[in-house]
Amino acid sequence: NTPIGILAGDAILSLAFKHLKDSSNIVKEKFNGALIAVCEGQALDIEFESLSKVKMADYLNMIHLKTAYMLGLSSELGAIISGADSEISEMFKNFGLLVGKAFQLQDDLLEIISTQDQMGKTLMSDIILNKKTYLMIKAEEKFPAQLREIYLNNNNNNPKINKEIRNLIINSSIVE
């Protein structure tokens, strides 16, 4: 339910600001910068849905902003608040960025190769929503003709399109 999700997000953000009021300026600045980055990343994700092709570099930038940035921030702020110097804080930030990118790549992969029971959510929504994931960008690079044929031959039959695209990705070297 989108309206409830928006309200919950607003409430959580308000709580975060409440707890940040006594934090140092650097913590506040970094937190606010991360909010903007996440919004930019989410905007790119939505924009990409309407594009027929997205470059891998653009996808990696999008997941950097949308997912990795917040994990990098969390790691960095933990270091700053604990009194670590800037060099150590930067190391923690970089660690968090890598974890965030790995998380998003794994989530994209599991969306294709796992089962609904394993994931606890509806699968293949990335295909239905025309999300530009690592796997879909690679599939478009390696199999543009096959993907066009799948879409043309299935008359917008989403379950069949999803199954054929999933099989194409799983049976190729993309997943490896």
What role is predicted for each listed range?
Residues 1-176:
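All-alpha prenyltransferase/terpene-synthase fold signal
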